[in-house]
């Protein structure tokens, strides 16, 4: 996959600084283009990662009931404004045929999908589809809640407003009780 071109990012950041009337050569900004390029390489590292790769490790386990990893912290960049949004992902699935993956793999997949220019809706559905395609579970449910800086620091300026998205597949789509169980676990504070 294509690597991030840090040199090109540095040049672009210098141009942005000049375009807003700043001097990119002043002391406080001198290393800013390099810092931004390094940061972009990190926060967009998911562009070079397929979330499905995290589900290649499968354990044969006779468990066909709910598995839920909740409160997976993530951060991403809004593809419309290139400003951060951040929050928590909750990932649930019901294994089929003994195909269980490591719990950390669910968190790693969230991170891989989030670390790219993104929409929250796409994060949610991509995680769900990755699990469906690799583990073939009875059902998958992904709920993502996030605060978007594009709504906090510009435009409508509504700090604290959270956006919630969900992707529901398989048994969770058809069984209201199964859906309710996941939502109840998510809601519960320990």
From Swiss-Prot:
Q: Between which residues do disulfide bridges form?
A: none
Pfam families in the record: GTP_cyclohydroI (PF01227)
From the UniProt record, give the pathway where this protein acts: Cofactor biosynthesis; 7,8-dihydroneopterin triphosphate biosynthesis; 7,8-dihydroneopterin triphosphate from GTP: step 1/1
Q: From which domain of life does this come?
A: Bacteria
InterPro entries (UniProt xref): GTP-CH-I_C/QueF, GTP-CH-I_N, GTP_CycHdrlase_I, GTP_CycHdrlase_I_CS, GTP_CycHdrlase_I_dom
Could you say how this protein's activity is regulated?
A: K(+) ions moderately increases the Vmax, whereas UTP and Ca(2+) and Mg(2+) ions drastically increase the Km for GTP.
What Gene3D superfamilies does the entry give?
Answer: 1.10.286.10, 3.30.1130.10
Enzyme Commission number, as recorded = 3.5.4.16
Please report which protein family the annotation says this sequence is part of: Belongs to the GTP cyclohydrolase I family.
Kindly provide the name given to this protein in its UniProt entry.
GTP cyclohydrolase 1
Tell me the gene name. Answer: folE
